[in-house]
Amino acid sequence: GLHYGDIFLGNIGGGDHYQHSVMGDIVNTASRIEGLNKHLGTRLLVSAEVIDRLGGLLSRELGGFRLKGKTSAIVVHELVSRLGEADGKQRDGCAVFAEALAAFRKRSWDEAAEKFRACMEYLPGDEPSSFYMKICERHKTDPPDETWDGVVAMDAK
Protein backbone atom coordinates (compact mmCIF):
# COMPACT_ATOMS: atom_id res chain seq x y z
CA GLY A 1 0.00 0.00 0.00
CA LEU A 2 1.18 3.47 -0.84
CA HIS A 3 0.39 6.69 1.01
CA TYR A 4 1.87 10.18 0.87
CA GLY A 5 3.07 12.47 3.63
CA ASP A 6 5.85 13.29 6.05
CA ILE A 7 7.73 10.53 7.84
CA PHE A 8 10.60 10.24 10.28
CA LEU A 9 13.57 8.40 8.81
CA GLY A 10 16.69 7.55 10.71
CA ASN A 11 18.70 5.23 12.87
CA ILE A 12 17.19 3.87 16.06
CA GLY A 13 19.14 2.14 18.79
CA GLY A 14 22.41 2.47 20.55
CA GLY A 15 25.61 0.69 21.44
CA ASP A 16 26.29 -2.05 18.94
CA HIS A 17 22.76 -2.27 17.56
CA TYR A 18 21.30 0.33 15.23
CA GLN A 19 18.34 -0.13 12.98
CA HIS A 20 17.54 2.12 10.04
CA SER A 21 13.78 2.65 10.11
CA VAL A 22 10.84 4.86 9.22
CA MET A 23 8.18 6.02 11.64
CA GLY A 24 5.05 8.09 11.58
CA ASP A 25 1.34 7.93 10.94
CA ILE A 26 1.94 7.80 7.18
CA VAL A 27 3.89 4.56 7.58
CA ASN A 28 1.11 3.05 9.70
CA THR A 29 -1.56 4.14 7.22
CA ALA A 30 0.40 2.71 4.26
CA SER A 31 0.61 -0.59 6.14
CA ARG A 32 -3.16 -0.56 6.73
CA ILE A 33 -3.75 0.18 3.04
CA GLU A 34 -1.51 -2.77 2.17
CA GLY A 35 -3.57 -4.99 4.47
CA LEU A 36 -6.75 -3.90 2.70
CA ASN A 37 -5.51 -5.76 -0.40
CA LYS A 38 -6.35 -9.13 1.16
CA HIS A 39 -9.94 -8.02 1.89
CA LEU A 40 -10.50 -6.57 -1.58
CA GLY A 41 -8.56 -9.18 -3.55
CA THR A 42 -6.33 -6.52 -5.07
CA ARG A 43 -2.58 -6.23 -5.54
CA LEU A 44 -1.70 -2.53 -5.40
CA LEU A 45 -3.74 0.02 -3.49
CA VAL A 46 -2.85 3.67 -3.02
CA SER A 47 -4.38 6.60 -1.18
CA ALA A 48 -6.03 9.52 -2.96
CA GLU A 49 -3.04 11.60 -1.85
CA VAL A 50 -0.80 9.43 -4.04
CA ILE A 51 -3.22 9.54 -6.99
CA ASP A 52 -3.24 13.35 -6.79
CA ARG A 53 0.51 13.32 -7.44
CA LEU A 54 0.64 10.69 -10.21
CA GLY A 55 -0.03 10.99 -13.89
CA GLY A 56 -0.30 8.61 -16.80
CA LEU A 57 -2.05 5.84 -14.87
CA LEU A 58 -5.54 4.41 -14.96
CA SER A 59 -6.84 3.96 -11.44
CA ARG A 60 -10.24 3.36 -9.97
CA GLU A 61 -11.49 4.66 -6.69
CA LEU A 62 -12.49 1.76 -4.46
CA GLY A 63 -14.17 3.98 -1.91
CA GLY A 64 -13.66 5.46 1.50
CA PHE A 65 -12.42 3.19 4.25
CA ARG A 66 -12.03 3.68 7.97
CA LEU A 67 -9.01 1.47 8.54
CA LYS A 68 -8.47 -0.46 11.76
CA GLY A 69 -7.04 1.79 14.44
CA LYS A 70 -7.90 4.98 12.53
CA THR A 71 -10.63 7.49 13.31
CA SER A 72 -10.77 9.29 9.98
CA ALA A 73 -11.58 7.74 6.63
CA ILE A 74 -9.19 7.49 3.71
CA VAL A 75 -10.10 7.20 0.04
CA VAL A 76 -8.36 4.27 -1.61
CA HIS A 77 -7.66 3.63 -5.30
CA GLU A 78 -6.49 0.58 -7.20
CA LEU A 79 -3.80 1.10 -9.81
CA VAL A 80 -5.14 -0.66 -12.91
CA SER A 81 -2.79 0.10 -15.80
CA ARG A 82 -0.69 2.69 -17.55
CA LEU A 83 -3.03 4.91 -19.53
CA GLY A 84 -1.46 3.98 -22.87
CA GLU A 85 -1.78 0.28 -22.08
CA ALA A 86 -5.34 0.26 -20.72
CA ASP A 87 -7.84 -1.61 -22.88
CA GLY A 88 -11.49 -0.76 -23.41
CA LYS A 89 -12.73 -3.36 -20.94
CA GLN A 90 -10.53 -1.94 -18.18
CA ARG A 91 -11.72 1.61 -18.88
CA ASP A 92 -15.37 0.58 -19.11
CA GLY A 93 -15.10 -1.58 -16.00
CA CYS A 94 -13.66 1.34 -14.04
CA ALA A 95 -16.47 3.61 -15.27
CA VAL A 96 -19.19 1.13 -14.27
CA PHE A 97 -17.52 0.62 -10.88
CA ALA A 98 -17.61 4.40 -10.33
CA GLU A 99 -21.37 4.38 -11.06
CA ALA A 100 -21.84 1.47 -8.66
CA LEU A 101 -19.89 3.25 -5.94
CA ALA A 102 -22.02 6.38 -6.41
CA ALA A 103 -25.20 4.29 -6.00
CA PHE A 104 -23.70 2.62 -2.92
CA ARG A 105 -23.01 6.01 -1.33
CA LYS A 106 -26.63 7.03 -2.02
CA ARG A 107 -27.84 3.89 -0.19
CA SER A 108 -29.35 2.53 -3.42
CA TRP A 109 -28.40 -1.04 -2.52
CA ASP A 110 -30.20 -2.81 -5.39
CA GLU A 111 -28.89 -0.40 -8.02
CA ALA A 112 -25.36 -0.57 -6.60
CA ALA A 113 -25.37 -4.39 -6.50
CA GLU A 114 -26.65 -4.51 -10.09
CA LYS A 115 -23.89 -2.17 -11.26
CA PHE A 116 -21.20 -4.06 -9.33
CA ARG A 117 -22.45 -7.22 -11.09
CA ALA A 118 -22.26 -5.39 -14.43
CA CYS A 119 -18.70 -4.35 -13.63
CA MET A 120 -17.78 -8.02 -13.44
CA GLU A 121 -18.78 -8.40 -17.12
CA TYR A 122 -15.90 -6.07 -17.98
CA LEU A 123 -13.56 -7.28 -15.25
CA PRO A 124 -14.31 -11.00 -14.73
CA GLY A 125 -13.76 -12.19 -11.18
CA ASP A 126 -13.48 -8.61 -9.89
CA GLU A 127 -13.14 -9.05 -6.14
CA PRO A 128 -13.79 -5.42 -5.16
CA SER A 129 -17.19 -5.73 -6.88
CA SER A 130 -17.87 -8.96 -4.97
CA PHE A 131 -16.80 -7.26 -1.73
CA TYR A 132 -19.32 -4.45 -2.25
CA MET A 133 -22.10 -6.78 -3.45
CA LYS A 134 -21.89 -8.58 -0.09
CA ILE A 135 -22.11 -5.29 1.77
CA CYS A 136 -25.13 -4.25 -0.34
CA GLU A 137 -26.90 -7.50 0.54
CA ARG A 138 -26.14 -6.99 4.23
CA HIS A 139 -27.31 -3.36 4.15
CA LYS A 140 -30.60 -4.33 2.46
CA THR A 141 -31.57 -6.38 5.52
CA ASP A 142 -29.68 -4.35 8.13
CA PRO A 143 -29.24 -0.80 6.83
CA PRO A 144 -26.74 1.56 8.44
CA ASP A 145 -28.12 4.36 10.59
CA GLU A 146 -28.79 7.85 9.24
CA THR A 147 -25.32 9.06 10.29
CA TRP A 148 -23.61 6.64 7.88
CA ASP A 149 -21.19 8.56 5.66
CA GLY A 150 -20.70 6.04 2.86
CA VAL A 151 -17.45 4.80 4.37
CA VAL A 152 -16.65 1.12 4.91
CA ALA A 153 -15.33 0.47 8.42
CA MET A 154 -12.63 -2.19 8.50
CA ASP A 155 -12.37 -4.06 11.80
CA ALA A 156 -9.40 -6.20 10.75
CA LYS A 157 -5.96 -5.34 9.38
Residue ranges and their predicted role:
Residues 18, 67, 148:
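Short clusters of hydrophobic/aromatic residues that line enzyme substrate/ligand-binding pockets
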Residues 8-34:
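Catalytic-core segments of nucleotide cyclases and related cyclic-nucleotide turnover enzymes
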